Amino acid sequence: MGFFDHLQKGGAFSLQAQKPQIRKVVQTRPPPPSRSSSHTPVRSLSQTSPPGRVKRPRDSTSRSVSRDPDHRPSKRLSTPLRNRKRPTPEQRFSSDDDASDTDTSFELRKRARTEDSAEPDLARRIRSLKAFSEENVKPLPLVHAADITSKQKAGNFRRAFGGADRPTEILLQYPSASLKERFNLVVPRDNDDFKPIDDIVHVIDIVSENYIPESEADFFNNESTGIKRRLRRALAHSSETEFREAVASYNREIERLRRSGAIAKHLDATHRLNLPLVERILTQIYARTVSPRVESLRRYENGTDNVYGELLPRFISTIFKETRLKSGHVFVDLGSGVGNVVLQAALEIGCESWGCEMMANACDLAELQQTEFRARCRLWGIAPGKTNLVRGDFLQEQSIIDVLKRADVVLINNQAFTPQLNNEIINHFLDMKEGCQIVSLKSFVPAGHKIQSRNLYSPINLLKVKQLNYWSNSVSWTDVGGTYFIATKDSSRLKAFADSME
């Protein structure tokens, strides 16, 4: 388990319909406690992993750049430092009276979960024309779900529906003209391992919500006969026959809608990707490339710039919204680890996306994610932005120094950076263009800083900073919320101060 594994639900058949028990309790309520006593439970899971993601600008390693356009993928990857479980939030069924005291705290802790994804970008073309071409359809160089389960030790998975004499393989069609993905109908013995049946059901649900015109939605969503209902029923009955029939019906319907042009027309009218779709694609990529090798990321050095930690997709999506990142912009992640954020920017926003990482193991995994990213985007019929991942020291790599001069948004997860590294980064702000936004977990501008004659030439005088909050489940090293900063390069204040001295 690793970075995106918290997005998977627990249990072998975790997606089957549950029958919640709802109890109404009538009681005389004591006088409500004062608001100060109302509790907002904040859970902090194991603190074994250090804060922040690893980035270290020294000992620069091999300098290879991997670009999206038909080049070998060599992108930077960042994976979570520790293998921790993120339990699915428990849904409570209670009376209205009981809920009244907890609504405020619940909304505060879960606000990020209910927010929508980035604003529509009318300049972005979501659909990949190549992915919908019926000519010369060839197998994609992707890792099939069946490859994950078949390569594991035989004892790690068991048949989901029994029947030792029957084959377990099943094919799933995606919205594009690409060939189907192979899955095995098995469940993991360890609840943290890959769950192919969950993935199938999630894919069908995401496709029905994001690719299907409203006029065709009943086939998927009808509460009695819809595909999603049939899948839940098959799992509840533990019926392989019903499950295969439902998937086969889904495959036929998707192929019909694609050939009729309905899916393409729907995508062409879409100008943003919803976050659940983004999360599903990123989760698939991570599960097929990084998760099987996540142990290689366990090596880190406390007290150095090589401590590893991740910003999770919903938090990153919030950053994209706050900075108003658009498809025509340039995004740079300094210390990109296994490349998760670089890929998310290219996928969710469609912008040119860059990352730089120097930890060799993370870079190796980034290259695997890069390759899978291209194939998965094609499978889902999406045209992402160009991605460029660079190995080496982001303070010294010329390609990064050059791209920073035209960057619109720069992300620096400096939670665990040493003061020396933070100071060295500041010097690069001089070359950034006006209006460039620098997002960080620690502010580069000290609280209460004022422009004075004695610090007139400090680069931080060019920055206008605002502080924002991130909520629970936003970072990999803690469940507790915190603060982050967006610094905008704005020379007007410094110019005004200099003019006042004349």
Curated annotation (Swiss-Prot):
Keywords: Chromatin regulator, Methyltransferase, Nucleus, Repeat, S-adenosyl-L-methionine, Transcription, Transcription regulation, Transferase
Catalytic activity: L-lysyl(79)-[histone H3] + 3 S-adenosyl-L-methionine = N(6),N(6),N(6)-trimethyl-L-lysyl(79)-[histone H3] + 3 S-adenosyl-L-homocysteine + 3 H(+)
CDD domains: AdoMet_MTases
Annotated residues for binding of S-adenosyl-L-methionine: 308-311, 331-340, 357, 393-394
Principal place of residence: nucleus
Family (UniProt): Belongs to the class I-like SAM-binding methyltransferase superfamily. DOT1 family.
Protein name per the record: Histone-lysine N-methyltransferase, H3 lysine-79 specific
